[in-house]
């Protein structure tokens, strides 16, 4: 950038007739362990993603030492993966074995509960809350960018609002943020938004609603109500409100009875008791086993699933809101993952931007880059300007498109030509280069040379 008349380059990249954009930022991931297990991060760089935010939904690998962490931590942690007594220990390991992408880290509330409490089916005691707050403060001092909760899941579902407020009150001093998978995204979604706004207001912290949606046929169309509710509170919430969204009508998480009840279809993504059934419809499995879908689900546990429980009109309405960021919420350890893991960003660019003309190309890129970096405090990321980090994605606006499907969910996208992270090419000619130049994005640090 700037006057390059006297500059020499190590190589030249032909970007004629291509879009040269800041590298995309995936603001909602569960890539904590895969950064170390599969550091080339093909599922991200093939989409043009150069930075990820991990530790979402209350689930982080640290600070926790546990041989067999309980659900939902098993979404990211196999036996032995939770081996970090401090958050800084985890960050140092990632720094010592860089991935192809940059990563910023949230401290998970469920992780704090598992590491602190002797029984999880209750509210935390005052000494336990003090311990969790202290662990959060240690993580924030080490460089975490905020606290995440997954109040929809055990063990956090047992946490009253006051517990979360007390722990989250550590955020303000670090100018960190509160990120939440809310307690409910169906019939009680408005009450859950109110709880979220209260936590942010009393903790004096910005709030980010994870994967905003309305689920269940009875709630189709209620995104009008939820978005108006968010807009109404934006003006009175002095610390900021934002949300992320993925461009699909199906969600994915652990196999839960209440989620099954909301869904028109359920696709099994993994099962520890029956791994051979990953990728199958739950209804077909039930027919094969000679039982109803709930009995079949019980036989598959522990397991995960894709739930078809949203309306396309709601997805489009939420995507169109100016405060929406893009986050994949992909689960990289699933045997048969949701296609969002490989297709989220090209799907926004190709299907929703180019084909449906839901918003301009410039607006689509803003939601994936500069706005996301600003919201999460990622300094000199998400922009193309002199002196900023050289995270760059080059793509063909005419051909970019997701190719991952629910049948073949691990198919790389089309139209992503070249991806650079911190000035190093990590993806070109349809392949990962093997370069691993990613940085750990500690809160307030990582300025370019």
Task: Show the residue positions of the predicted features.
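Active-site microenvironment of metallo-dependent hydrolases
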Residues: 45, 258-449
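Short acidic, glycine/serine/threonine-rich loops at helix termini
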Residues: 62-68, 114-120, 161, 190-194, ...
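Short, ordered loop/turn segments at secondary-structure junctions
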Residues: 3-4, 57-58, 152, 182-184, ...
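Di-metal (Zn2+ and/or Mg2+/Mn2+) metal-binding site signature of metallo-dependent hydrolases
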Residues: 19-43
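Histidine-rich, glycine-flanked metal-binding segment
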Residues: 1-23, 38
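Histidine/acidic residue-rich metal-binding segments in metalloenzymes
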Residues: 89, 123-149, 155-300, 306-325
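Divalent-metal coordination cores built from histidine and acidic residues
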Residues: 37-145, 237-239
